[in-house]
């Protein structure tokens, strides 16, 4: 459908360690529940989110090959985090777009003014906070790590 509506679009498929995605999402949702519930339902979060992410990623692995190589690319989180401007350049090149000096300067200004960790970092612990062993979860998602060059982040 996307290609029918936007035939000249370039699709960038992003990839990240699903264990890191799950711990981040569950932590954010648990914090949100603390605002409007008497009790955070940790068990429900721990049961639902790994299943949901697995379903989504299995579909991603199955359907990624349907996107034409000429108008799609994969972007890993670790590549983006290592050098965000290099990833922007790759995306522009894949899309056949010119990355103007002005656009580059404005993006670099934003990056410089919003450094990662500026406001601290969330400390995650899947085992202690949610009773989930990251190694078990990582093995569950082996199919995804095998399909895409994703680096493990979560410990």
Listing of model-derived features with the role each one plays in the protein:
Residues 1-15:
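ATP-dependent NMP and nucleoside kinases share a basic, alpha-helical "lid"
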Residues 5, 22-74, 78-155:
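PAPS-dependent sulfotransferases, especially Golgi type II membrane carbohydrate sulfotransferases
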Residues 18-19:
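Sensor-1/coupling segment of RecA-like P-loop NTPase cores
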């Amino acid at each position: 459908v996307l290609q029918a509506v936007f035939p000249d679009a370039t699709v960038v498929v992003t990839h990240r360690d699903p264990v890191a995605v799950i711990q981040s999402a569950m932590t954010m949702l648990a914090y949100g529940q603390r605002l409007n519930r008497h009790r955070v339902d940790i068990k429900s979060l721990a049961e639902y989110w790994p299943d949901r992410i697995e379903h989504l990623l299995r579909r991603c692995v199955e359907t990624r090959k349907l996107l034409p190589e000429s108008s799609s690319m994969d972007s890993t989180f670790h590549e983006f985090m290592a050098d965000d401007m290099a990833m922007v350049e790759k995306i522009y090149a894949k899309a056949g777009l010119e990355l103007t000096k002005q656009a580059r300067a404005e993006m670099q200004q934003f990056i410089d003014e919003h450094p990662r960790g500026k406001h601290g970092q969330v400390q995650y612990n899947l085992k202690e906070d949610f009773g989930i062993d990251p190694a078990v979860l990582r093995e569950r998602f082996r199919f995804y790590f095998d399909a895409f060059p994703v680096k493990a982040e979560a410990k």
